[in-house]
Amino acid sequence: MSVYLLCKNPIANLERLHFPYTPQIDYSQDVKHEIYGLTHTNYQPYAYTRSENPSINLSCKFSAHTESHFVMAEQALRFLRTYSKMNYGRTDPQRGLPPRILNFFAYGATVFNDVPVYISKFNMVFPEDIDYVTGTFDSKGQLVSGSRIKETTTGVQTRDPRIPSTQVQNQDTNGATSPAGEVKNNQTYEISLPVLFTVNISLLVQQNLHKTVNEFTLEKFATGELMTKGYV
């Protein structure tokens, strides 16, 4: 019962966004009708105009209580930030490309299977009343070590005394240390994430118009044949 977002032409190593906990999915379909403004009648007839693209909204929980969950949460944030942006900049050979179309999978072949989507919005709250976890990454983005940071009511960070202080500092090649979170000589860097948090993601379904014109029939849709090909 896997739920995930897939990028078929990924940037760097951001190919798939897994959800460690089953997300809440809010799926809706709007059907538009226009009214005929006839006079001298109590009941105006409607005329069908179009069926809107379905909308998919996810409410996803992430945690950072283990190294694997911490890495998954960090990659999720990086995934969402990356695929909500276009290629840009003079040194980018693909500058001008819009954000990537992703493919959404959930609950089997005729529910959400290979559905082409854009990220239209995402948001995350960094709570003030929860513990934070700090992880150290190397210059290649690989997790080196993790340590627990406790957020006090005064807003001052205090280190868990069970964790060696070297795990909450960056160390350069000469043995010098720098405050947590600061990049030192491009050797390592630290980030902190809530031990438990929620990310809300809004997706827009974006079908290929050429394919829909040439392969869509309501009969094929009703039998489930087209649902296996990304139609919802």
Where are the language model's segments positioned?
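Compositionally biased, intrinsically disordered low-complexity segments enriched in polar/Pro/Gly
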Residues: 1-232
